[in-house]
């Protein structure tokens, strides 16, 4: 009979395998709005040079020279730790921030903390996000941060992942706990969705807390409800549930969000990063797309993709006459009829 630790580790490895399968089979489609529902209005006289572009973003007291980071994926098993080490090496080489996957397993079984700590050893001077669930205590939040000497903490809110999970939580009283952690922790706290987007109601609730940032984790990226349905026997289907990344960005605008904003959920190109910036994001991040490329082609190819994104983003800034992110925010987008309908309904 498997021990509790072995069961937890098996679940971690199942998540990895199913996330890879999800992206390999291109199941990351959403019934909601996508970035193709908006088009960038060009500036034919940009009066700019590619050498004069500065797309760095000042967030959480840190200058991110490229407004993108490697999002939380995994950790806590031999396979997962190897992937985290590869991601940390990529992040170091590309001067990117990185988030580790949920550290719950290492908080419960401290002997597994070394795999997470290795990320800091590799990316010694990089910006790292620790990661815990919203039900964890302030003490566990501090332990997670200390484990990787993190610069910030992601608290994931994952109701739509827990409910399809046979062994998942069934009680979700999180808001007060999140605020306690955010108000007492010494590093910035980011609340992160895990693939279902964030509504105006949630933005407004978080506005009253001490959290520093919100990661919208919209539909269109890895769908953890799909992953848990594959693991489960209950067949609870949430394929059509939630808000897409683009819809969540619009919700943030309509909620007059003032927290730092991170666009995650199916980010696969520089153009999607650029549109996210136009719509108010301070940073973008990606997990599943990076994982798929890492497992299919290896770390060198992932670095090539990121290098290409940097070049492409530079060109998009020039094409719109934007020297920096402040000017990028003024770029006009042409909205599709579906996008206009969404805005009208949600006003």
Swiss-Prot record:
GO terms for biological process: isoprenoid biosynthetic process. Mg(2+) binds at residue 162. Its cofactor is FMN; NADPH; Mg(2+). Its EC number is 5.3.3.2. SUPFAM superfamilies: FMN-linked oxidoreductases. It is an enzyme of class 5 (isomerase). FMN binds at residues 72-74, 102, 131, 192, 222, 287-288. Transmembrane segments: none annotated. One of its GO terms (molecular function) is magnesium ion binding. Keywords: Cytoplasm, Flavoprotein, FMN, Isomerase, Isoprene biosynthesis, Magnesium, Metal-binding, NADP. Substrate binds at residues 11-12, 161. Gene3D superfamilies: Aldolase class I. Pfam families: FMN_dh. HAMAP family: Idi_2 (MF_00354). This is Isopentenyl-diphosphate delta-isomerase.
